[in-house]
Amino acid sequence: MPNPPSFKSHKQNLFNSNNNQHANSVDSFDLHLDDSFDAALDSLQINNNPEPLSKHNTVGDRESFEMRTVDDLDNFSNHSSDSHRKSSNTDTHPLMYDNRLSQDDNFKFTNIASSPPSSSNNIFSKALSYLKVSNTKNWSKFGSPIELSDQHIEREIHPDTTPVYDRNRYVSNELSNAKYNAVTFVPTLLYEQFKFFYNLYFLVVALSQAVPALRIGYLSSYIVPLAFVLTVTMAKEAIDDIQRRRRDRESNNELYHVITRNRSIPSKDLKVGDLIKVHKGDRIPADLVLLQSSEPSGESFIKTDQLDGETDWKLRVACPLTQNLSENDLINRISITASAPEKSIHKFLGKVTYKDSTSNPLSVDNTLWANTVLASSGFCIACVVYTGRDTRQAMNTTTAKVKTGLLELEINSISKILCACVFALSILLVAFAGFHNDDWYIDILRYLILFSTIIPVSLRVNLDLAKSVYAHQIEHDKTIPETIVRTSTIPEDLGRIEYLLSDKTGTLTQNDMQLKKIHLGTVSYTSETLDIVSDYVQSLVSSKNDSLNNSKVALSTTRKDMSFRVRDMILTLAICHNVTPTFEDDELTYQAASPDEIAIVKFTESVGLSLFKRDRHSISLLHEHSGKTLNYEILQVFPFNSDSKRMGIIVRDEQLDEYWFMQKGADTVMSKIVESNDWLEEETGNMAREGLRTLVIGRKKLNKKIYEQFQKEYNDASLSMLNRDQQMSQVITKYLEHDLELLGLTGVEDKLQKDVKSSIELLRNAGIKIWMLTGDKVETARCVSISAKLISRGQYVHTITKVTRPEGAFNQLEYLKINRNACLLIDGESLGMFLKHYEQEFFDVVVHLPTVIACRCTPQQKADVALVIRKMTGKRVCCIGDGGNDVSMIQCADVGVGIVGKEGKQASLAADFSITQFCHLTELLLWHGRNSYKRSAKLAQFVMHRGLIIAICQAVYSICSLFEPIALYQGWLMVGYATCYTMAPVFSLTLDHDIEESLTKIYPELYKELTEGKSLSYKTFFVWVLLSLFQGSVIQLFSQAFTSLLDTDFTRMVAISFTALVVNELIMVALEIYTWNKTMLVTEIATLLFYIVSVPFLGDYFDLGYMTTVNYYAGLLVILLISIFPVWTAKAIYRRLHPPSYAKVQEFATP
């Protein structure tokens, strides 16, 4: 790498205190630091200069940097580890960069956090080694040019200057999902096709015809089949790409009003820093920071179903600092600092600054991500912060892994055997000829070309088209409505599933939550005793206006105490949530990220305390008994996330001027936050055994002084651009999350989905081992497993929980090695221990168990389990789920199934197949999986039989011609045989089925046979090889016997043998059909008629006069009888002696 420019020799040019001189002496250049450079500079500190660079000396709209101790730059590389250690205790300010410089003085640095110093003696040189070169013209006078990139560093945005001066600094916002362009389409597609052995083999065969010594017959005989395959594939790809381009064009040309430019421009032309106005129903064109909303509260709702698959509306709020600013102030007087682009849609760090003095933090609540939709009425004004491939939507769009079905792998193995047969047969025929000339290797090559039909070029096209047929049949099956096939390459794998990994909530259960029980330590209330709770809630308003002792409600001392406790519990439940009431067409609906929260709000409504109004600053509750409202000011909200497993809120009671911190969450985390008690763990277990999802409710009263101290430290932490979440969490823990008053416990019921019990029983009888992987508690998972019939009545459940030591994990396996009929129940902590230390030993045992239930699983553990089962067993694994936490597991499966549920469409969008209910899985596997696998297996073998039989005819003819490699069928005959004369009847096998649909559910054991792969195996393949050898030999030998090999009779022999070949294939298809339908009958008759009609046009190949004689028809009949009758007889006898299971079932079911 070239040496970096010398800063010392040019420091006067770079950092001159006179800004005008600085602007004249330094050409425009950009210094961008990539992620690696940031990491290297994290440990840099300047020993003698606590403030190395500061941003000041503003001249008009231009700002520049002053280097106070410029010589320190030259000393960077000379600092020893000792000097670094001395400076480690010195407070240093982070280097700041500025994006407002003009093009003439655009020198920028990124933030460099203070961290422990590096021990390197030349750390600055190492840091500079990560720099890249971008502007050779402007850096040429400093030595080697340097390129730096702004794409992956923190960015500072000024609406008045960034879109103008930095227009080329950030990526374009033009959307492009097209795979090809006019130049790359043909070469790219040809490469993709010819990397497959099939197509490359036939290309070589076709090209060989350009060599005179290898030329056999007509060039079209070899070019046309390959061209047909490529044309079908290229047409399909072209249509798909044109549709992608059309969708891209529509999105790119959507107009948006840009305030900073005072005109409407297409989405593709938006730049970072543009202020745009978005109206209700508009798609968000880029990642935006919400600055203003037409709602006085600054609130806006967005739909994120196209981003994360969740169907509920998300609340977004405008920055308070900018909500009431004029458009002129928004353009000229604010700046936005945004963190580097990243994938997480739930995380954003930034701040907005007004007049270079007042700042407000920015979080994900202030963002509008690209590809979401503004749902609330009115409009909003937002600033573009990320464009194009830097947006969250683009960064989370990954190219789906191309899945290859097991059947394709098996066919590929068989094709290799066929290829070996071609080589062996070619060498054998030349050997029989005695290698009589010096050009024997040319004869081998000519035989390879003649026998190329053994590897059928049309096999891939037939299978691909068949998959499309299966997908159409699945999507149009009225018994499983709204099913979507997203991956059409693996429908056959639906018939080979041996392991089913399922989520619980929303998959086996309805995800329709109802709060069934609340427990207050000494007493619990259920849905049957809600009237008692309602009575207590009635006293809520009077007890707030007057003291409870003066209340008109006469209560005993015990009931007074209980009234207080119930009141506090219900009031906390009504306040501590993120639910927002919305009105669409005068209908009240609740919007929330979790159905649990909606269930809780509906429960408080049922007992007389309903959510009346909520915005970002306040929440109002309606006391239905008195008609009065209870108003609370929302001071801070701490949303739920999968890491914290809790949510909290700070409110001020406007009537009593009291400050309260309220929190609810999982028992595993809340037990450490609430005051010590002797009942929480026991009651949590009791509720879980009832199948209820539990939440622990607590609260804490704050005095105003403590709250103000918390707010100050929390605000300071929220402005940090380094480890913001960690700093904020530390402040919350310090002031809030300890010694909470334990109010009670809620139990929410999630009912089983329709027909889950019968579906699981069917799948287990079909030989599928079912695992349930859930993030819920052990007791809840156990209860749901029993009710869903995952665990049979009386079946022993071996429980492994809280295993934290490797030796303890190993000892737990001993029992399971002995009792293979037991069910395993394991928690995530123990599972993690096995995955880390005893993966091989653990899965060697548990893959044989009928049922495994894993609780408290993380999304990554779910994915790991799927991957390990696939690796260890080699069996097909199906994963099914409905939530975002199931996506990893679904994508790691051989077959991923997503359920469109109340958690949204994220799992559905990531899956290979999307269904609406778990019970639809039985239809998908037992019926469509069976048909897809058996049909494709038969289709593949028929296509190979079609190629083998014509190759056998060619081999017999070559042997009878004294081992001369002369083509038997040439030109159109070769092309027509594989297309017009046999393709439609053979392909009609994709409509066949060997058993009625209803019987697949009555006898699910039939599915177990499919997993053994008997429909396409080496055994069945060799049966078809022998069949082809017999029929091909009969057709060719008898055709030659009825005519001769003389040139005058050659066309007669070809006429009778080719006709026999075509009719034989049509009859074989008819014999293999189990259930006839109109389409099959039409294809058989139409194909035969087409051949008959085309015969008069084949005078170049046939002796047409001979085809009108009685001898011709007599000979044809004899050939067909000898070719077909023995095969039909053998098949009938075998079926009588060894009837297949489906035949027994079909016969038994037929009245």
From Swiss-Prot:
Annotated spans, Required for endosome-to-Golgi sorting: 51-104
Presence of the UniProt keyword Glycoprotein in the record: no
Recorded topology in the membrane: Multi-pass membrane protein
Entry's localization field: Endosome membrane; Golgi apparatus membrane
Enzyme Commission numbers on file: 7.6.2.1
Binding site for ATP: 503-505, 597, 640, 642, 645, 664, 693-694, 774-776, 856, 862, 885-886
Region described as Disordered: 1-21, 73-95
Pfam families xref list: Cation_ATPase, E1-E2_ATPase, PhoLip_ATPase_C, PhoLip_ATPase_N
Biological process annotations from GO: endocytosis; phospholipid translocation; protein transport; retrograde vesicle-mediated transport, Golgi to endoplasmic reticulum; trans-Golgi network membrane organization; vacuole organization
Outcome following mutation: residue 228 to V: Decreases cell population growth
Record topology, Cytoplasmic segments: 206-209, 389-416, 460-947, 992-1020, 1074-1078, 1131-1151
Recorded catalytic activity of this chain's protein: ATP + H2O + phospholipidSide 1 = ADP + phosphate + phospholipidSide 2; a 1,2-diacyl-sn-glycero-3-phospho-L-serine(out) + ATP + H2O = a 1,2-diacyl-sn-glycero-3-phospho-L-serine(in) + ADP + phosphate + H(+); a 1,2-diacyl-sn-glycero-3-phosphoethanolamine(out) + ATP + H2O = a 1,2-diacyl-sn-glycero-3-phosphoethanolamine(in) + ADP + phosphate + H(+)
Subunit structure as annotated in this protein's UniProt entry: Interacts with MON2. Interacts with ANY1. Functions without a CDC50/LEM3 family accessory subunit.
Similarity section: Belongs to the cation transport ATPase (P-type) (TC 3.A.3) family. Type IV subfamily.
Function: Flippase that catalyzes the hydrolysis of ATP coupled to the transport of lysophosphatidylserine, phosphatidylethanolamine, and phosphatidylserine from the lumenal to the cytosolic leaflet of the Golgi apparatus membrane and ensures the maintenance of asymmetric distribution of phospholipids. Does not appear to transport phosphatidylcholine or sphingomyelin. May be involved in recycling from endosomes by driving the formation of SNX3-dependent recycling tubules.
Protein name, entry field: Phospholipid-transporting ATPase NEO1
Organism of origin: Saccharomyces cerevisiae (strain ATCC 204508 / S288c) (Baker's yeast)
